[in-house]
Amino acid sequence: MKSLHTICLLFIFIARGNSRSCDYCHNIGKDCDGYEHECSSPEDVCGKVFLEISSASLSVRTVHKNCFSSSVCKLGHFDINIGHHSYIRGRINCCEKEPCEDQPFPGLPLSQPNGYYCPGALGLFTEDSTEYEAICKGTETKCINIVGHRHENYPGDISYNLKGCVSSCPLLSLSNSTHEENRNYLEKVECKDAFKIASH
Protein backbone atom coordinates (compact mmCIF):
# COMPACT_ATOMS: atom_id res chain seq x y z
CA MET A 1 0.00 0.00 0.00
CA LYS A 2 2.24 2.75 -1.34
CA SER A 3 -0.21 5.33 -0.07
CA LEU A 4 0.85 4.49 3.47
CA HIS A 5 3.56 7.08 2.88
CA THR A 6 0.89 9.44 4.16
CA ILE A 7 1.18 7.87 7.61
CA CYS A 8 3.72 10.61 8.21
CA LEU A 9 0.67 12.86 8.11
CA LEU A 10 -1.16 10.86 11.04
CA PHE A 11 0.24 13.31 13.63
CA ILE A 12 1.64 16.04 11.38
CA PHE A 13 0.15 19.05 9.91
CA ILE A 14 3.32 19.72 7.78
CA ALA A 15 5.65 22.72 7.50
CA ARG A 16 5.47 26.34 6.47
CA GLY A 17 6.84 29.19 4.26
CA ASN A 18 6.71 30.24 0.30
CA SER A 19 4.28 32.29 -1.77
CA ARG A 20 1.15 30.15 -1.47
CA SER A 21 -1.02 30.57 1.61
CA CYS A 22 -3.34 27.90 3.03
CA ASP A 23 -5.65 27.46 6.00
CA TYR A 24 -4.00 25.92 9.08
CA CYS A 25 -6.14 24.20 11.73
CA HIS A 26 -7.08 20.87 13.32
CA ASN A 27 -10.20 19.72 15.12
CA ILE A 28 -12.35 16.74 16.06
CA GLY A 29 -15.12 16.26 13.50
CA LYS A 30 -15.46 17.12 9.82
CA ASP A 31 -14.21 20.71 9.64
CA CYS A 32 -12.13 23.33 11.42
CA ASP A 33 -11.52 27.08 11.39
CA GLY A 34 -8.00 28.41 11.78
CA TYR A 35 -5.70 31.00 10.30
CA GLU A 36 -3.95 31.45 6.98
CA HIS A 37 -0.21 30.84 6.77
CA GLU A 38 2.39 30.78 4.01
CA CYS A 39 3.68 27.50 2.61
CA SER A 40 7.33 26.49 2.35
CA SER A 41 8.87 24.48 -0.48
CA PRO A 42 8.08 21.72 -1.40
CA GLU A 43 4.63 22.24 0.17
CA ASP A 44 3.01 23.97 -2.81
CA VAL A 45 -0.70 23.13 -2.56
CA CYS A 46 -3.42 23.41 0.08
CA GLY A 47 -4.76 20.23 1.59
CA LYS A 48 -7.15 18.69 4.06
CA VAL A 49 -6.43 15.41 5.89
CA PHE A 50 -9.10 13.33 7.57
CA LEU A 51 -8.01 10.77 10.17
CA GLU A 52 -10.27 8.11 11.60
CA ILE A 53 -9.88 5.57 14.38
CA SER A 54 -12.74 3.15 13.86
CA SER A 55 -14.11 -0.14 15.14
CA ALA A 56 -17.31 -2.03 14.53
CA SER A 57 -19.21 0.07 17.07
CA LEU A 58 -17.40 3.43 17.26
CA SER A 59 -15.43 5.85 15.12
CA VAL A 60 -13.62 9.10 15.93
CA ARG A 61 -12.64 11.45 13.12
CA THR A 62 -10.37 14.47 13.07
CA VAL A 63 -9.64 17.03 10.37
CA HIS A 64 -6.33 18.81 9.66
CA LYS A 65 -5.76 21.61 7.13
CA ASN A 66 -2.31 22.77 6.00
CA CYS A 67 0.15 23.05 3.11
CA PHE A 68 1.23 19.83 1.35
CA SER A 69 3.52 18.80 -1.49
CA SER A 70 1.92 17.69 -4.77
CA SER A 71 3.68 14.30 -4.57
CA VAL A 72 2.20 13.53 -1.15
CA CYS A 73 -1.25 14.57 -2.36
CA LYS A 74 -1.16 11.86 -5.04
CA LEU A 75 -0.90 9.14 -2.37
CA GLY A 76 -4.51 9.58 -1.36
CA HIS A 77 -5.18 7.28 1.59
CA PHE A 78 -3.96 4.62 4.04
CA ASP A 79 -5.54 1.91 6.20
CA ILE A 80 -3.85 0.10 9.13
CA ASN A 81 -5.44 -2.80 10.98
CA ILE A 82 -4.29 -2.16 14.57
CA GLY A 83 -6.15 -5.13 16.05
CA HIS A 84 -9.20 -5.52 18.30
CA HIS A 85 -11.33 -5.10 15.15
CA SER A 86 -10.06 -1.53 14.82
CA TYR A 87 -8.45 0.49 12.04
CA ILE A 88 -6.67 3.80 11.80
CA ARG A 89 -7.35 5.33 8.41
CA GLY A 90 -6.45 8.53 6.59
CA ARG A 91 -7.68 10.41 3.53
CA ILE A 92 -5.87 13.38 1.98
CA ASN A 93 -7.47 15.90 -0.37
CA CYS A 94 -5.49 18.67 -2.09
CA CYS A 95 -6.47 21.65 -4.22
CA GLU A 96 -5.00 24.71 -5.90
CA LYS A 97 -7.24 27.01 -3.88
CA GLU A 98 -9.52 26.79 -0.85
CA PRO A 99 -11.86 25.17 -0.04
CA CYS A 100 -10.65 21.65 -0.82
CA GLU A 101 -13.29 19.05 -1.60
CA ASP A 102 -13.84 16.28 0.94
CA GLN A 103 -13.02 12.63 0.21
CA PRO A 104 -15.44 10.35 2.11
CA PHE A 105 -14.43 7.26 4.06
CA PRO A 106 -15.81 3.96 2.76
CA GLY A 107 -17.21 1.45 5.22
CA LEU A 108 -14.84 -0.73 7.21
CA PRO A 109 -13.37 -3.69 5.29
CA LEU A 110 -15.44 -6.86 5.46
CA SER A 111 -12.50 -9.16 4.69
CA GLN A 112 -12.11 -12.39 6.63
CA PRO A 113 -9.02 -13.35 8.70
CA ASN A 114 -6.30 -14.73 6.41
CA GLY A 115 -4.29 -16.84 8.86
CA TYR A 116 -1.67 -14.19 9.69
CA TYR A 117 -1.14 -11.83 12.61
CA CYS A 118 1.06 -8.88 13.62
CA PRO A 119 1.85 -7.02 16.83
CA GLY A 120 -0.78 -4.31 17.18
CA ALA A 121 -0.57 -1.03 19.08
CA LEU A 122 -1.86 2.53 19.05
CA GLY A 123 0.29 4.66 21.33
CA LEU A 124 -0.31 8.39 21.55
CA PHE A 125 1.93 10.65 23.64
CA THR A 126 4.31 7.73 24.08
CA GLU A 127 6.82 5.81 21.98
CA ASP A 128 6.31 2.69 24.13
CA SER A 129 2.88 1.09 24.06
CA THR A 130 1.38 -2.21 25.12
CA GLU A 131 1.30 -4.72 22.27
CA TYR A 132 -1.52 -7.09 21.50
CA GLU A 133 -2.24 -9.49 18.65
CA ALA A 134 -3.71 -7.93 15.51
CA ILE A 135 -5.39 -10.57 13.32
CA CYS A 136 -4.71 -9.73 9.67
CA LYS A 137 -7.50 -9.84 7.10
CA GLY A 138 -7.84 -10.07 3.33
CA THR A 139 -4.63 -8.97 1.57
CA GLU A 140 -2.90 -7.85 4.79
CA THR A 141 0.31 -9.90 4.90
CA LYS A 142 2.81 -7.31 6.24
CA CYS A 143 3.47 -5.91 9.72
CA ILE A 144 4.16 -2.18 10.12
CA ASN A 145 5.80 -0.46 13.10
CA ILE A 146 6.14 3.34 13.04
CA VAL A 147 7.54 5.48 15.86
CA GLY A 148 7.86 9.24 15.74
CA HIS A 149 7.07 12.56 17.34
CA ARG A 150 5.76 15.96 16.42
CA HIS A 151 7.19 19.09 18.00
CA GLU A 152 4.68 21.74 19.06
CA ASN A 153 5.27 24.96 20.95
CA TYR A 154 2.46 23.75 23.23
CA PRO A 155 2.23 21.13 24.74
CA GLY A 156 5.68 20.20 23.39
CA ASP A 157 6.75 16.92 21.79
CA ILE A 158 3.85 14.59 20.95
CA SER A 159 5.16 11.03 20.58
CA TYR A 160 3.33 8.21 18.83
CA ASN A 161 3.72 4.51 18.04
CA LEU A 162 1.64 2.62 15.47
CA LYS A 163 1.72 -1.14 14.87
CA GLY A 164 -0.55 -3.37 12.83
CA CYS A 165 -1.32 -5.23 9.60
CA VAL A 166 -1.00 -3.64 6.16
CA SER A 167 -1.27 -4.92 2.60
CA SER A 168 2.22 -3.80 1.53
CA CYS A 169 5.25 -1.99 2.94
CA PRO A 170 5.37 1.80 2.53
CA LEU A 171 8.42 3.72 1.35
CA LEU A 172 9.22 5.89 4.35
CA SER A 173 12.48 7.60 5.30
CA LEU A 174 13.68 8.42 8.79
CA SER A 175 13.77 12.12 9.62
CA ASN A 176 16.73 14.27 10.58
CA SER A 177 16.87 15.00 14.29
CA THR A 178 15.68 18.56 14.84
CA HIS A 179 13.12 20.45 16.88
CA GLU A 180 11.56 22.83 14.40
CA GLU A 181 8.03 23.70 15.49
CA ASN A 182 5.03 22.14 13.72
CA ARG A 183 7.07 19.39 12.08
CA ASN A 184 6.79 15.61 12.22
CA TYR A 185 9.81 13.33 12.67
CA LEU A 186 9.91 9.61 11.95
CA GLU A 187 12.35 7.85 14.27
CA LYS A 188 11.61 4.22 13.43
CA VAL A 189 9.97 2.55 10.43
CA GLU A 190 9.88 -1.26 10.23
CA CYS A 191 7.90 -3.41 7.82
CA LYS A 192 8.22 -7.17 7.55
CA ASP A 193 6.24 -10.29 6.74
CA ALA A 194 3.31 -11.10 9.00
CA PHE A 195 3.45 -14.15 11.27
CA LYS A 196 1.56 -17.30 10.38
CA ILE A 197 -1.00 -18.32 12.99
CA ALA A 198 -0.08 -21.77 14.28
CA SER A 199 -2.67 -24.44 13.53
CA HIS A 200 -3.88 -26.52 16.45
UniProtKB/Swiss-Prot annotation:
It is found in: Secreted. Keywords: Disulfide bond, Glycoprotein, Phospholipase A2 inhibitor, Secreted, Signal. One of its GO terms (cellular component) is extracellular region. Residues 1-19 form the signal peptide. Disulfide bonds join C22-C46, C25-C32, C39-C67, C73-C94, C95-C100, C118-C143, C136-C165, C169-C191. It comes from the Eukaryota. Pfam families: PLA2_inh (PF02988). Glycans are attached at N176. Gene3D superfamilies: CD59. Expressed by the liver. GO terms for molecular function: phospholipase A2 inhibitor activity. Occurs as a mixture of oligomers. Tetrameric arrangement appears to be the predominant quaternary structure. Inhibits the enzymatic activity of phospholipase A2 (PA2). Belongs to the CNF-like-inhibitor family. This is Phospholipase A2 inhibitor gamma subunit A. It comes from Gloydius brevicaudus siniticus. The lineage of its organism: Eukaryota, Metazoa, Chordata, Craniata, Vertebrata.
